[in-house]
Amino acid sequence: MIFDKQDLTALFITLKLAVMTTVILLIVGTPIAWWLSRSRWRFKFLVEALVALPLVLPPTVLGFYLLIALGPHGPIGGLMEALGGRPLAFTFTGLVIGSVFYSMPFVIQPLQNAFTAVGRRPLEVAATLRASPLDRFFTIAVPMAKPGFITAAVLGFAHTLGEFGVVLMIGGNIPGTTQVVSIAVYDHVEALEYTQAHWLSGCLLILSFVLLMTVYGINRRFSVVQA
Amino acid sequence: MTIEARFHIDRGEFSLNADLAIAGKGVTAVFGPSGCGKTTLLRAIAGLEYNEDGYLRVGDQIWQGDGQFLPPHKRSIGYVFQEPSLFAHLNVQRNIEYGLKRIKGAAHKASIDPTIQLLGIGHLLNRRPSQLSGGEQQRVAIARALASSPDMLLLDEPLAALDDRLKQEILPYLESMHRELEIPVLYVSHSRDEVVRLADHLVLLDNGRVQATGPVGEVFSRLDLAITHDADAESVIETTVAGYDEAFGLLRLDFAGGHFSVAASPLPAGRTVRLQVLARDVSLTLAHQQATSILNIFPATVDQLVQESDAQMTVRLMAGPVPLLSRITRKSTEDLGLKTGDQVYAQVKSASLLIP
Amino acid sequence: MEVLIPKRIQLSLILALTVTFCAGQVLADEIRIAVASNFAEAIKEIAERFEAKTGHEVILAYGSTGKHYAQIKNGAPFEAFFAADVERPKLLEDEGRALSGSRFTYAVGKLVLWSPKPDVVDANGSVLNTGDFRFIAIANPKLAPYGKAAKEILQARGVWDQLQKRIVRGENINQAFQFAHSGNAELGFVAFSKVKRPNRAVPGSFWQPPQSLYSAIDQQAVLLKSNATARAFMAFVQGEEACTIIQSYGYGTL
């Protein structure tokens, strides 16, 4: 095995980051996606644009703003320090925060689409069958939106696996804490260690491809069943 | 139990202005042309259309009024939508149990087996909605609505999305439901056929306003309403089975104004049967004809006359307390010298049983 | 009274001016130089003096030495390469991509431990041992000579292992400086040239470790194309005027 301990650590950190980011986004993103799919507020488009922003912003821009925000002079970092905590630059927590912003649209948009596809009728029906709003959400909307949840989870996970620009800005490349695979590959190439670069990159490529195959496979299966 | 409702709902180009009282028993049909606001009214009663300033009292509960608005999931209703709206991710059994599982304790009334029997869906319980026909889906939807033991059943044109064959398949179920249910039923429809077969009371709606309310037989005979002036003007008469003439295959039906003899299969005595008598099948004579092929002749008083056109007149008669419509030529009215208060004999050439 | 300039002299004047003007245009050359990030400001001043003197244009591209090396290997069109180490120019020379014999040391990098805040780093660098900080920034030792030097110093002071989780690695010396400068890392090993400016005191606090603690960071340059202007530039860089500039920016010269 060509992997050395540091590379394996990088893989582990990357997977840990992807899992945590995905879980947080599913928890936080579901109510947002639900609101977006139900609301008829005329300024909803502002929120949708905000959510979509990380899709088009260069990751380095996002990383730059995060670095300022998380640093000791920034709003979040300053607040943390005032509360007796530590600033978040160069910490795994800081990476998680950055990844949550970075992968946000990849989780919220599929969820929003899936909730919209559920439509109003099933929920009205459930209301006439004594289901409270929360009950309707969990017993009708969520199960009917299952393909959306799977897509959101897989896309959020896979997207975080490939994160580079944001981590480059706020990660600090600390092995065992913030050194993720994409940075490790970059460093290997810079240092002319092509073999290791090949192994790590290949690993990530296969993992990403398998994940994407899963998404498309599942969605195909679901659309066939509901036909 | 009575139901009192007052709604004023503006939906852009359309507005509903309804003020009505609904009987707490039997089937009340909300009848009118498409787009007149029937569905909006039903949804408002169910709480699905949030509106300000409405008023709704059901029995002794105020569901809306004085700034209160009871959300739909707190109202004891069963609602059947126009398109079959079964939950695609649950099988038939779980669909039916959905509302049942959510009513608490004492409200947990009798089991759902009788309902399943009544609607003939026992053999479908393990299937998924996508495997059912439109008619089967609607029957499941009705069972589902009833399973939660609601105090009121609301049906929004449940047959509209079905083709004729499926409609005919379900109507009998609806009719037996009508006989068996003890809760008020609100039935929205634009189909005269359905209304005449199923309704006890009628709310006539047009352009967002209530035109008339009352027992179905009475509303259908009111000459101040447009429905009595088209070619299909009819009378709806409630009768009771009195006997059966086996030799001639005739069913004898008693009503408050006399009795009918109708060619039909036997039915148990005492059973109520609704008769549909088209106005154009009713002719009038001043003297009781003796040697005539028409079996159904009874005395009646002329109540009202309305000219339909140069040639046609509609006459409203009272056979005892029961109204009856007759469509004859204007010439005949003049020849017979008909006017309000005259005693005549109504001759009904044919009558259809609406409930077999 | 009119002053008449004889026609012949007029013509000669015009000709002379034209020739000089054209000569200036024809001879004005443009050279591209890849420069290690840390040397950016010094080279800028040097290039400006050169341009003023000779009329040639010097186009500078800043970046990490590793990246430049890879680009040059793949045919990037630079006339000369100012690296932050010795290794890359040597490799290019060995691989035949640089003119042999043109390699020379143009500056000696000096490393300092620096903090933008006045009382953080004392003149002996004992803050390294007290460990009174959350993060310390260095350039990535695998990629940058300054980073390698920082590692050597930390190892010499015996704190490399225990500080592992607190050492933040910048992709290049500039990012390391940015981490320290922004306060995200309280202090960092940066190029002296980043904080030393001509005619100004160094802001914040710093410790200049003795050269014996770390491998010399000879920064070497090499010619990539046989170009007269480029040669002239290289000569200029080794001249006295350039050396003064180089030293005022915090480098040593040979």
What are these regions (language model features)?
Chain C
Residues 2-13:
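Bacterial N-terminal signal peptides that target proteins for export
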Residues 11-22:
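Bacterial N-terminal signal peptides
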Residues 101:
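Active-site phosphate-binding/coordination module
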